[in-house]
Curated annotation (Swiss-Prot):
It comes from Burkholderia pseudomallei. Immunity protein component of a toxin-immunity protein module, which functions as a cellular contact-dependent growth inhibition (CDI) system. CDI modules allow bacteria to communicate with and inhibit the growth of closely related neighboring bacteria in a contact-dependent fashion. Neutralizes the toxic activity of cognate toxin CdiA (C-terminal 282 residue CT fragment) upon expression in E.coli. Does not inhibit toxic activity of CdiA from other strains of B.pseudomallei. Gene3D superfamilies: 3.30.190.30. SUPFAM superfamilies: ImmE5-like. This is Immunity protein CdiI. One of its GO terms (biological process) is bacteriocin immunity. Signal peptide: none annotated.
């Protein structure tokens, strides 16, 4: 199954099973779950880009970008970073309803 670029995904499972980093558009709840579960998959959230969903389509917003840490990092540092990423999505979810998560492996790009 390929990632549908014209769809907003509501499940973090889809992100991990399809390799959604950088391209998958996620609902706020799914993006929060991705951030919270990323460490379990050996990933660190390096960037989140938020926007507004127009069915279909993603309007990226320059006022909704969060930059995390770049790998390589250890697991503890990644977990702290990923929790901060989840908090960012929570704080932006009233104004923005779709998010793109960039999450490389903690060992490096």
């Amino acid at each position: 199954m390929n990632i549908d670029l014209q769809r907003r995904y509501d499940s973090s499972d889809d992100f991990f099973s399809l390799g959604g980093s950088v391209v998958m558009k996620l609902s706020a709840d799914a993006a929060i779950a991705v951030c919270e579960r990323a460490g379990q998959h050996g990933l660190v959230v390096a960037r989140i880009e938020g926007g507004i969903w127009h069915f279909p389509g993603f309007e990226a917003r320059l006022d909704c970008i969060w930059d995390g840490i770049d790998p390589p990092v250890d697991v503890g540092v990644a977990e702290q970073n990923n929790l901060a990423a989840a908090e960012f999505v929570r704080s932006e979810s009233q104004e923005h309803d779709v998010f793109v998560v960039t999450a490389p492996e903690i060992t490096g790009w």
